[in-house]
Each structure stands twice: as structure tokens, then as C-alpha cells.
Amino acid sequence: APALPDRRVIDTPYISQVTPVYAPVGCEPTSLLMGLKAKGYAQEVDLRSFLDAMPKHEYDPAQGFAGSPYQPDQSKRTTIYPAKLAEYGRQYGDVADFSGRSVEELQRELLSGNPVVVYVTLWWAEPYYRTYRMGDHEETLLRNNHAVLLCGYDSQTDQYNVADPYN
């Protein structure tokens, strides 16, 4: 395999989840769409079409986006989990679920020119949790969840380029 560069910034078209399409809890699919477009996929797909075509579920983010990306809902864990998001992304291009991979593996992907959707907390704040009704049971889950797209890395400074669809 060829040696990887020390630094790489992936040319990524920025897409906001707030304007012109207002999808205040649609960070995961918005980040994915930026990543797809950065790789040359989904060039003709606009955010609203992408959000509307995404798999949905009444309450279970493992089965589809829980709730609506257009409407905050305190009673629902409004997100879509990585495996289902990656499955959706594969309709448009080469997408992998990198859940549980090491930081070094993520850095290698970035230096290889592959953007990575990462699940973080909103504004990088301390995580906080609440209990959600999940069908016939309850689960305590992260409340201030957010997703952004890593689209660059510098191994000399250990800094990342981040495309945050909310900011």
C-alpha cells in the first residue's frame, strides 16, 4: 500500500441542517450527505429529498430515524444509529459502518481521502442522559447527541477538519 500523507483535507461541500432546509435534529443524514458528495456520490440529491427518503421508525433508531428530522421531540430519541445510516448511504455509494473502530483507523480513513461521520455531543458538551420509551420498555440514552463529518486530519498537529451541519 502506498504511504499515506501526513495531512489531508477532503474537499467537502458544506450543507447546513438549519438553512435553507430546517432540520434541527437531522444532523446524522446531513453529515452523511456531505460525505457522499465529497466522494462524488449523490451529486444531484438535495437535502430535503435525502431526508425524506431516509428509513424512519416510530421510536427505534436502530430501525430508522426515530421521529422527524424536521421536528425536535423530547419524547423520542431523535436519531438514526450508525448501522442503519450506513445501510441507507450504501444506496448512493460506498459507505461502511465504522462503529467501534479505533481512532487510528479513523485517522487512516481520513488520510486515505474518506470522510467519516462521527457521533459526538452537541457543541462538544458533557454528555447527559434521559430515559426514553422504546416500545415495550425504557432505555436511558444520550440526550445531547449530535453528528458531524470529519473531513480532514493532520498527523503532525493531531487536528481534525470538521464540517458541523448545525454551525
Protein language model regions, located:
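Active-site-adjacent structural segments surrounding the nucleophilic cysteine of cysteine proteases
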Residues: 1-83, 122, 129-132, 156
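Short secondary-structure junctions and interdomain/linker hinges
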Residues: 61, 96, 116-117
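Mid-length scaffold segments of soluble, non-membrane domains
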Residues: 71-112
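Active-site-adjacent substructure of cysteine-protease-like catalytic cores
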Residues: 100-161
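Short, solvent-exposed aromatic-acidic interface loops
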Residues: 164-167
